[in-house]
């Protein structure tokens, strides 16, 4: 009979593998839901924190504070917005069909020819995302029970969704790839979860059709052009309930990065791989302020990889109980486009 890890087993794993104590008891409880020692071990060994501790592991280099501004065109009209979204859908429909797991976590062991040996590790890694979110809430005296309607933007093949469904009363998740969604549905049904709804992203609603109390996205927004990122955030903040929280990650700076809509649209017919994009931090703050959302914390994380010159931020916003738009002006580097 397989014995599930106890709370003390989890604490010991933290001490032995990460050299520290667990953040709090909520994190310990989330790890216990993995159900087996094999899953626990694989999730810890696959974590970015453990990998960063290994001798010779690449370390992120901080971008200096004197870094120059970047030129990003982030607003557009409806026609160009639809063209950009159609491109994103085409890319991810193909990736979701050809290399579904690798398109979510781009490691060689998750390529189609290797996934049979690493499926358990792949899905176990989703526990870390849920644990990070719960810990993030905990730092501000908040708990999942306060946010019954949770929305996961970019659920992929269902790597994280089951863990979110264990922590939140009702979970709605979406993705732009139909093949991803089919696989996510299989994971949800296989786990016997009856509190999950899956929406396919088909237009400017981005799969968000009703209000929610908490919005979460990680390793997703960065693969969308800046105008699409901005459109997604506007939709998110507009539907976030008063007092609700938005927790998400995206790159906000990259040395030498530049984005112009017209040249990009002219070249997308030749593109087809995974793209990495940036939405500058002042733009994120401006959009949030327009919908009465204020930052609780902004952390620099390593979610964009250890590529030199890149900055990725983990944001936590909360919407005011009474929506009051806040004024926020931008400098000339952030253009509205047409």
Task: State the predicted function of each range.
Residues 1-60:
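Composition-driven recognition of low-complexity segments enriched
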Residues 3, 16-22, 174, 210, ...:
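Helix-turn-helix-type domain boundary/helix-start signal
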Residues 6, 10, 217, 280:
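Hydrophobic (often cysteine-bearing) scaffold residues that line and stabilize catalytic clefts
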Residues 62-167, 172-207, 224-231, 235, ...:
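Class I (Rossmann-like) S-adenosyl-L-methionine-dependent methyltransferase catalytic domain
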Residues 206-215:
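A short acidic, Gly/Pro-enriched loop at the edge of an enzyme's catalytic core
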Residues 214-227:
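A short SAM/SAH-binding and catalytic strip from SAM-dependent methyltransferases
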